[in-house]
Amino acid sequence: MRTEYCGQLNLSHVGQQVTLCGWVNRRRDLGSLIFIDMRDREGIVQVFFDPDRADAFSLASELRNEFCIQITGTVRARDEKNVNRDMATGEVEVFATELTIINRAEPLPLDSNQVNSEEARLKYRYLDLRRPEMAQRLKTRAKITSFVRRFMDDHGFLDIETPMLTKATPEGARDYLVPSRVHKGKFYALPQSPQLFKQLLMMSGFDRYYQIVKCFRDEDLRADRQPEFTQIDVETSFMTAPQVREVMEKLIRQLWLDVKGVDLGEFPVMTFAEAERRYGSDKPDLRNPMELVDVADLLKSVEFAVFAGPANDPKGRVAALRVPGGAQLSRKQIDDYGNFVKIYGAKGLAYIKVNERAKGLDGINSPVAKFLNAEIVEAILERTGAQDGDMIFFGADHKKVVADALGALRLKLGKDLSLTDEAKWAPLWVIDFPMFEDDGEGGLSAMHHPFTAPKDMTAEELKAAPEDAVANAYDMVINGYEVGGGSVRIHRGEMQQTVFGILGINEHEQREKFGFLLDALKFGTPPHAGLAFGLDRLTMLLTGTDNIRDVIAFPKTTAAACLMTEAPSFANPTALAELGIEVVKKASPENK
């Protein structure tokens, strides 16, 4: 039906007769001529109709936005004064001699001339996806997956599918359950990841596996989360953590070159402890120059319990955050930031405004200055590198509260004061995570997942001091986003059972939930390691959007609903009966 795409026409096509198919993006009737911008997935080209071609001109007068049409015409070069530098096809136009209206469009529920609500965009997603910027994002996503497949094939990885209907295993979030008709009362689970299957593939001898795979998690959604998402899933045998990182870093560096024409350079490597200490985050945005600086040793003897308490507590921390140019902040802005850090458990936000450092106490403005002598103030200014016009904010509390609060404040200030270099790319690896964390109920939970191996520990040593264990895990972070994470896996049964025991999973439960894995570990399991990238998040970064729904063709809302298809929906009672399921309605208060 077509000979060319609209968006690919250029001066090399001048004089050629072409047939185009697409949609009317805009129509302009000048009386003697009718112009339309015609759009397809590759872009937009200007088409015009002349009264001398009476049939085509008459039909063109009926055109409205989003009519689906076919035109045949001749490509012409535009006069220099009419060249549109803002269009890829702006040097040419098409003189249409034939027009076919393939399908008319009713008045549109979306207005291309204004910002539509996200609810409307999701309800009429098929119209929203016609917008060039949305089409471009999905084309970029397709380019990413195509590149990944070529790279993995070239590096000896096998694309192997794993089951979508599997067994529920504890991986941190709730499972989506699928009832079995054949085995009434039993349920499959949709996979939160192919984690155990890819480990079993290594035990099967496949050595290098990858898969671009859907995963499912029934969890409370955030703006950057979806109930179903896509991973680039990778697993290898007989490779160390540094070797896995080397191959995966090569993949991402070459991907950025291919898609963006940008060389990310060699990725720095930072431990979890250093990232938390310097940036208050295990996924630091290195485009932001601000760092947290420990000052507890300077404040142990001050007569100010807010500082002295955490400074003398082994579990406490006092840290300072220097904000270049921050002295310009108003009292209201400071109060707003004080309320902001309370979200993360902080009780407030002490500060020092540095007006003229050379004047000592007389050159600063601070509500806590009365508790500090000139020597302490100068030591703080020296350690933080403060200059005239800077602001220093303080966090004083439990270590985690200080890291979370000042880490979040650092990001917010970086954005609010334009301190973060938005034009920069800042990748890194974060390694050496704690293996376990407090579960809030007196026990421990796995910081990553229960199949991650500890670093340089025997099973006996791990059992004796699990709180000291460092996971042989690694996360790839770009511009403050965790784009991928992985680890060396446990490949010995004794170690796996020890980890399960530390997590409070007794032997009976281990056999019930993971018997197949424990059995497989008895038969010559190779050392193996892997990683998974979030395809959605990679696409967000490479397309410059901060909304994950912009890079998924048919996403869900934050309430895990599809406004277009109205999923989820009530099931047919007959289908439920076949599954042995009865919907129990909540009793009203008066009937209780």
From Swiss-Prot:
Any one GO molecular function term: aspartate-tRNA ligase activity
PROSITE patterns, alphabetized: AA_TRNA_LIGASE_II
Residues that hold L-aspartate according to the record: 171, 217, 448, 489
BP GO annotations: aspartyl-tRNA aminoacylation
Top-level class of the enzyme under EC nomenclature: ligase
Keywords of this entry: Aminoacyl-tRNA synthetase, ATP-binding, Cytoplasm, Ligase, Nucleotide-binding, Protein biosynthesis
GO cellular component, one term: cytoplasm
Top-rank taxon, per record: Bacteria
Major localization class: cytoplasm
Region (Aspartate): 195-198
Binding site for ATP: 217-219, 226, 482, 534-537
InterPro entries per the UniProt record, alphabetical: Aa-tRNA-synt_II, aa-tRNA-synth_II, aa-tRNA-synth_II/BPL/LPL, Asp-tRNA-ligase_1, Asp-tRNA-ligase_1_N, Asp/Asn-tRNA-synth_IIb, AspRS_core, GAD-like_sf
Subcellular localization, as worded in the UniProt entry: Cytoplasm
Classification via Pfam families: GAD (PF02938), tRNA-synt_2 (PF00152), tRNA_anti-codon (PF01336)
UniProt-listed Enzyme Commission number(s): 6.1.1.12
ATP-binding keyword on record: yes
Entry keyword Kinase: no
Catalytic activity reported: tRNA(Asp) + L-aspartate + ATP = L-aspartyl-tRNA(Asp) + AMP + diphosphate
Family in the record: Belongs to the class-II aminoacyl-tRNA synthetase family. Type 1 subfamily.
HAMAP family recorded: Asp_tRNA_synth_type1
Cited function: Catalyzes the attachment of L-aspartate to tRNA(Asp) in a two-step reaction: L-aspartate is first activated by ATP to form Asp-AMP and then transferred to the acceptor end of tRNA(Asp).
Assembly mode: Homodimer.
Protein name: Aspartate--tRNA ligase
Lineage: Bacteria, Pseudomonadati, Pseudomonadota, Gammaproteobacteria, Enterobacterales
